């Protein structure tokens, strides 16, 4: 397994819509392991493939509490099939927008259909932090960032800040595979 470089704002790759995974095979399982290792190293609780430069509809997450054993999960081609009408508010952050956090309103519960690492279709009914994390990461697969839920003024301030920071650092190396 390997830690992969993170794609950060304002990289336009983050706005790209990811393509469906065609086949679950050993190379995809290895990539899932790389994604989990990258997420834990960052540290974070969720990571979409696009955040490590791969425009695939795949995400990993682990929403276990710090005092609980790790619970890594991999979602391939995830799709939200239902949402509750009840709103939920959580402070969100993002490994692609480091050190910026904001409260975001999302549906409190979602049902997500996905494929697991064995190639089997699964369904999860999620609430709480799991629902929030799944929605955040699935948004990444659609080119949507959590700052898109903020007011235009706040969003523009964040984008300006990260554009300025990007001018001061070299572009990230991209792995081609």
Swiss-Prot record:
Positions of the catalytic residues: 137
Chain sites annotated for binding Fe cation: 94, 136, 140
Gene Ontology biological-process entries: co-translational protein modification; translation
Transmembrane segments annotated in the record for this chain: none
GO MF, one example: metal ion binding
EC number(s) recorded for this UniProt protein: 3.5.1.88
Keywords: Hydrolase, Iron, Metal-binding, Protein biosynthesis
Free-text comment on the cofactor: Binds 1 Fe(2+) ion.
Name under which the protein is recorded: Peptide deformylase
Species whose genome carries this gene: Chelativorans sp. (strain BNC1)
């Amino acid at each position: 397994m390997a830690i992969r470089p993170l794609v950060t704002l304002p990289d336009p790759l983050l706005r790209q819509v990811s393509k469906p995974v065609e086949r679950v095979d050993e190379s995809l399982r290895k990539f899932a392991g790389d994604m989990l290792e990258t997420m834990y190293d960052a540290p974070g609780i969720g990571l979409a493939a696009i955040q490590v430069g791969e425009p695939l509809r795949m995400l990993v997450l682990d929403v276990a509490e710090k005092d609980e054993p790790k619970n890594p999960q991999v979602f391939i081609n995830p799709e939200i099939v239902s949402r509750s009408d009840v709103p939920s508010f959580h402070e969100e952050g993002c490994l692609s927008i480091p050190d910026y956090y904001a409260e975001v309103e999302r549906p409190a519960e979602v049902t997500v259909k996905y494929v697991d690492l064995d190639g089997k279709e699964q369904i999860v009914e999620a609430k709480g932090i799991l629902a929030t994390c799944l929605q955040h990461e699935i948004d990444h697969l659609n080119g949507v960032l959590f700052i898109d839920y903020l007011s235009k003024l706040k969003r523009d301030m964040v984008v300006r800040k990260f554009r300025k920071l990007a001018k001061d650092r070299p572009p990230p190396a991209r792995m081609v595979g």
